[in-house]
Regions:
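Outer-membrane beta-barrel porins/channels
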Residues: 1-291
Length: 291
């Protein structure tokens, strides 16, 4: 610490459109039984996105900046300031495309009389095969008067995605109990496996537009997510009221920037991770009336 101060600001806004295709089947293995099995496939969501970002970093104070030892072009070792004082910032506008992963899933459901319903779903998504795409041109359709943009895969970013992300499994189980015809009690649990590999990191050295336009360096290596839900539903003639509570919990390791390793260990900069918890409580209510 050198006695100086800093403050920072960052704002990111992403807008766009996307589309996907879903297909599935449901069948009953035994015609006389309410037990059913389902399967589905979900195509990637094909996003066309626009990013607008801004950031500013200010360094100020009455002391000289801290220094570190480094070699100059002539090989002489000297003290080099860790930073320069003043305001440094930039604004970024960038258009790109992103294809999310393919997803497949299977489900099972069963009912007991008219008072109990049980369900379970397993889904797998190939997050390590997302396709980051760069807009690299286009053409004009003179007949229709429209301009169509073309894009190609960002090979460097996609290689980094495969190195740091992995397939994600999602398990959902739930039950609904109807003690009376007017009242429903609901319980559920979701488990989502980690998207990030154990030693995943945000690589700021790859040759990709996604790195060139970045306005921050921090990242969080999130672990598995658990969701617990419960709810109650009330129906009376044409009126229905539903109240649901959901608790989501997830742990992660926060890093301010990636590790930088130098041949001279004294010049290496390896940050210490910080354990973080992302716990969220949600209460939802829906009121409906049938006319």
């Amino acid at each position: 610490m050198d006695g100086n101060y800093s403050d920072s600001y960052e704002e990111i806004r992403i807008t766009g459109t996307g589309y996907d295709v879903k297909a599935g089947v449901i069948f009953r293995p035994v015609e006389e039984s309410p037990f059913r099995i389902g399967a589905y496939v979900n195509s990637p969501v094909f996003y066309d996105l626009s990013l607008s970002a801004a950031h500013d970093l200010s360094m100020y104070g009455g002391e000289a900046p801290a220094t570190f030892q480094d070699k100059d072009a002539a090989g002489n070792i000297g003290n080099v300031p860790c930073y320069t004082k003043g305001d440094k910032g930039q604004t970024v506008d960038y258009d790109f495309r992103l294809n999310t992963p393919w997803k497949v899933g299977v489900s099972m459901g069963h009912t007991v009389g008219n008072y109990l319903a049980l369900g379970a779903t397993y889904e797998y998504a190939w997050y390590d095969h997302m396709d980051n795409r760069v807009k690299d041109g286009g053409y004009y359709d003179y007949y229709w008067g429209d301009y169509y943009e073309s894009s190609s895969s960002d090979d460097a970013m996609n290689a980094d995605t495969r190195a740091n992300l992995k397939g994600v499994s999602t398990l959902k189980v739930g039950a609904e109990i109807k003690p009376t015809s007017m009242l429903s009690l609901r319980f559920g649990y979701n488990y989502v496996s980690p998207m990030f590999r154990e030693n995943a990191y945000r690589d700021q050295s790859i040759g990709s537009n996604g790195v060139d336009i970045a306005t921050s360096t921090d990242y969080t290596n999130w672990k598995a997510m658990n969701r617990f839900t419960c709810g109650v539903g009330f129906n009376y003639e044409n009126l229905n009221i539903d109240v649901a509570y959901q608790y989501t919990t997830q742990k992660g390791d926060f890093y301010p920037f990636m590790s930088y390793v130098n041949e001279n260990a004294a010049l290496s900069n390896i940050p210490t991770s910080c354990k973080v918890d992302n716990n969220r409580h949600q209460l939802l209510m829906t009121v409906g009336y049938k006319f």
